[in-house]
Amino acid sequence: MDVVFALGGSVLMPKEGASTENIQNYAKAFKKLKEMGHRVSVVVGGGNTARQYISVAREFANESFCDEIGILATRMNSMLLISALGKDAVKQVPENFKDAEIILNMDKILVMGGTHPAHTTDAVSATLAEFIDADLLVIATNVDGVYNKDPRCNENAVKLDKINTKELLEITGSSSMSAGSSGVVDPLASKIIDRAKLKTIVVKGIPEEILASVTGNHNGTTITP
Ligand code: U5P
């Protein structure tokens, strides 16, 4: 299967900082999927590094400048994952989808970060999945699925096991577009998932759920056209 993962920067690089074991466990999961014969792409987010830098820069700069800072953080996190993947990856972070596809065609795990301002790496992962005709997009993030309301501010929010892309558009449509924002799925990504009719799974970004999203029995939300 041809699978694109959006790996939240905050799961790869939690608030407490980088941990060798944590990065290694993600690298192992992606290597395992490659060994099983899957074609694997990983789009890495900017996490806390991006958010810390953006919150200071915002005092001086406009949103697209802050986005550019966020993009640099996504590429730095990408380099960290690439370092742990060793010979299974290429020591370069592509900045567009054509260069990304060349890496996949070299039979390597593709790792990339952001591309242009005004969206998050969710939108990058959805566009990459469309561009390479992937079979599955997996959004591995800091929540365990899509809820009917934002679970961070609604105690009675309910996790949805299965939704369609139109329902995803309704749920995510009102999320913020400002630099560093962190809704469960970026609204632009939802639009791309809908237009490209991409089968998508949103799971908690832990190695076990990343593996289960491809092999079955994950605990997240499945989104179908
Ligand atoms: N960002 C972009 N374009 C991209 C990827 C990221 O502008 O293609 C910026 C956004 O401000 C985003 C931040 O919130 O970098 C960190 O990425 P993410 O962790 O939110 O995906």
From Swiss-Prot:
GO terms for biological process: 'de novo' CTP biosynthetic process; UDP biosynthetic process. Its EC number is 2.7.4.22. Pfam families: AA_kinase (PF00696). ATP binds at residues 9-10, 47, 51, 141-142, 147, 150. The keyword Secreted does not apply. One of its GO terms (molecular function) is UMP kinase activity. Inhibited by UTP. Catalyzes the reversible phosphorylation of UMP to UDP. This is Uridylate kinase. It comes from Methanococcus maripaludis (strain DSM 14266 / JCM 13030 / NBRC 101832 / S2 / LL). The lineage of its organism: Archaea, Methanobacteriati, Methanobacteriota, Methanomada group, Methanococci.
